[in-house]
Amino acid sequence: MPTVQLRRYEIEDGQMDVFLPYWKKLIEQREKFGFRVVFAYVDETNNDIVWAVEHDGDFAAAEAEYFHSSERAAALIGAPLVMKGIKVGMASRVV
């Protein structure tokens, strides 16, 4: 069974259209490390993007490899500085 992580990014007002193309580039890089996006939604009321990512195997090790990768570093070049906050947590299925 895959491990699932929930992520919520709070974006500066009016900047979601700037952030989403950058976020999609990072998702492409994560997928190269075996991650899969379970869902992703924009909460327009709170200007958040809420998403879940899963990985089979050792999530923490794969995430560390991804975070320290040259692919991720390259994707971060020119990143818009529009995130106000991040919340991250591991998920447990209830239904």
Language-model features, listed with the residues they occupy:
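Specificity-determining recognition surfaces
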Residues: 92-93
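An amphipathic, aromatic/His-enriched active-site/gating alpha helix that lines ligand/cofactor pockets
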Residues: 18-42, 54-89
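Accessory recognition modules or surfaces
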Residues: 1, 6-7, 47-60
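Surface-exposed interaction/gating patches
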Residues: 2-18, 33
